[in-house]
């Protein structure tokens, strides 16, 4: 099935979900936003709704109220959100997976492993625009539950061009459940590169949380330090729902603070926050 047909199916499913969306957004669907991504399944076998819903309750401590299940869909309400899981009996477009795999440093074997998936479970979490952190937490737990219930290789977040392998993803999700540690690497892509002896990097995914992306350019620091600084800055923004102002300092790498300034993007499009690092 081609991409056009896939989005047609998802559109029809979204119509079915309209009443649930209204509930999740405080009866005002105009204020809702969707977190979406795909679990890459190894086999063309629909999900077992009964088993999955039970695992979400017992293993992941998620309330699954008002559950409505079909042959290929599972829809239920959780506190502050509505979740839909749609089984699609065809893979994510190979071109998408190939492009994401080429930049995937977290999943070094993604080109070979992710491309072998046969089907996908598309997970959508609908929540109010001001609750994106909670929506991403829910998404992560649901995705990890699907990963543990089925033979699957990983998760693909299409809005971030992000591929995350199964082992890393489930470990991060359990750490979120047990320790409330935010799995930022499962939500935001961190690109790094070195040119002419200088290091640089950028985030791609902060837009999901209503924030501008961040960049570091022409840094004399090592690549791993650039990535660590970007990670700490992204964590600060997501964790605190922080609204950054020009010239503000934000904490990174322990007690160190870095000044951020808004300017034209170096690696991305539009304007980004530059970390003076």
What is each residue range found by the language model?
Residues 2-11:
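Bacterial N-terminal signal peptides that target proteins for export
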Residues 22-26:
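Boundary at the C-terminal end of the N-terminal hydrophobic targeting segment
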Residues 33-41:
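Short glycine-/aliphatic-rich beta-strand segments at the starts of folded cytosolic domains
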Residues 43-111:
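N-terminal low-complexity, intrinsically disordered segments
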Residues 58-65, 142-156, 236-244:
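Structural alpha-beta junctions
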Residues 90-183:
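Internal, hydrophobic cores of structured domains that mediate oligomerization or house catalytic pockets
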């Amino acid at each position: 099935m081609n991409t056009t047909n896939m989005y047609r199916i998802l559109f029809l499913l979204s119509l079915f979900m309209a009443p649930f969306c209204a509930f999740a957004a405080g009866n005002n669907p105009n204020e809702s936003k969707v977190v979406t991504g795909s679990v890459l399944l190894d086999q063309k076998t629909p999900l077992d709704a009964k088993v999955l819903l039970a695992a979400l309750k017992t293993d992941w401590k998620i309330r699954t109220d008002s559950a409505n299940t079909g042959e290929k869909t599972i829809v239920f309400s959780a506190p502050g959100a509505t979740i839909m899981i749609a089984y699609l009996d065809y893979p994510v477009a190979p071109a998408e997976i190939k492009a994401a795999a080429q930049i995937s440093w977290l999943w070094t074997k993604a080109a070979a492993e992710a491309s072998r998936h046969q089907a996908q479970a598309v997970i959508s979490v609908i929540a109010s625009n001001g609750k994106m952190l909670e929506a991403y937490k829910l998404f992560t737990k649901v995705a990890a539950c699907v990963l543990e219930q089925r033979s699957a290789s990983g998760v693909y977040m299409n809005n971030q061009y992000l591929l995350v392998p199964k082992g890393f993803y489930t470990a991060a999700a359990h750490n979120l459940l047990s320790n409330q540690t935010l799995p930022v690497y499962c939500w935001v892509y961190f690109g790094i590169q070195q040119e002419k002896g200088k290091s640089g990097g950028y985030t791609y995914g902060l837009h999901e949380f209503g924030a501008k992306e961040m960049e570091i350019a022409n840094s004399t620091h090592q690549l791993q330090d650039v990535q660590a600084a970007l990670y700490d800055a992204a964590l600060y923004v997501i964790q605190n729902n922080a609204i950054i102002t020009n010239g503000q300092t934000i904490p990174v790498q322990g007690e160190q603070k870095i000044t951020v300034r808004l300017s034209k993007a170096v690696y991305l499009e539009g304007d980004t926050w530059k970390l003076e690092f």
